[in-house]
From Swiss-Prot:
UniProt protein name: UPF0301 protein CGSHiEE_01530
PANTHER family registered for this protein in UniProt: UNCHARACTERIZED PROTEIN YQGE (PTHR30327), UPF0301 PROTEIN YQGE (PTHR30327:SF1)
InterPro entries: AlgH-like
Pfam families according to UniProt: DUF179
Gene Ontology CC annotations of this record: cytosol
Length: 186
């Protein structure tokens, strides 16, 4: 079984549905299936707005950057998934993804955002991407996805619109290579 947990999946150009030009960070991959978060499709909801909506009765004294909530995938689109650097805080529903990263689905992590108790780096997603047993492996063998080791800089620090090109460049691929490869296909 190929090891995909903690890796990036890069959508090949012929994927023209929800996953067109996406980069997915793989949070879980085992014999039951796979789950990941699209990291380069921001919604129109900022993390500051999300915090305010969830805590509308509380005084908002938090400091937020201008990070947006991303659309993590077409499954469970009303559910929040927070991918973050590991912390000393013990959140209720946290799953260790790699030695450095965890995913939390409980609201207690949201309560720390914008404060000194927040994880050092985090990505907030609504929805996730999931595959049944063997489904993702088949899609990879059908050349729907490229697989590459993830980089925290792309995951947390890079502008959303640059993440697809940057992930491809980890493999030495530049966008114009795809344009040339598409000539003659109808």
């Amino acid at each position: 079984m190929m090891e995909l947990q903690g890796k990036f999946l890069i959508a090949m150009p012929h994927l023209d549905d929800y996953f067109n030009r996406t980069v997915v960070f793989m949070c879980e991959h085992n014999e039951q299936g796979s789950m990941g978060l699209v990291i380069n499709q921001p919604t129109d909801l900022s993390i500051a707005e999300l915090y305010s909506k969830l805590n509308f009765m509380m005084k908002n004294d938090r400091t937020f950057g201008n990070e947006m909530v991303v659309a993590g995938g077409p499954v469970h689109t009303e559910r929040g998934f927070i991918l973050h650097k590991n912390t000393l805080n013990a959140f209720q529903h946290t799953y260790k993804v790699t030695e450095e990263l965890s995913m939390t689905t409980s609201a207690d992590v949201v309560e720390t955002l914008g404060s000194t108790f927040a994880p050092e780096k985090y990505l907030v997603a609504l929805g996730c991407s999931s595959w049944g047993a063997g489904q993702l492996e088949k899609e990879i063998s059908d050349n729907a996805w490229l697989v590459v080791s993830s980089k925290d800089q792309i995951l947390f620090d890079m502008p959303y619109e640059d993440r697809y090109v940057a992930a491809n460049q980890l493999l030495g691929i530049h966008p114009y290579n795809f344009a040339l490869a598409q000539v003659g296909h109808s």
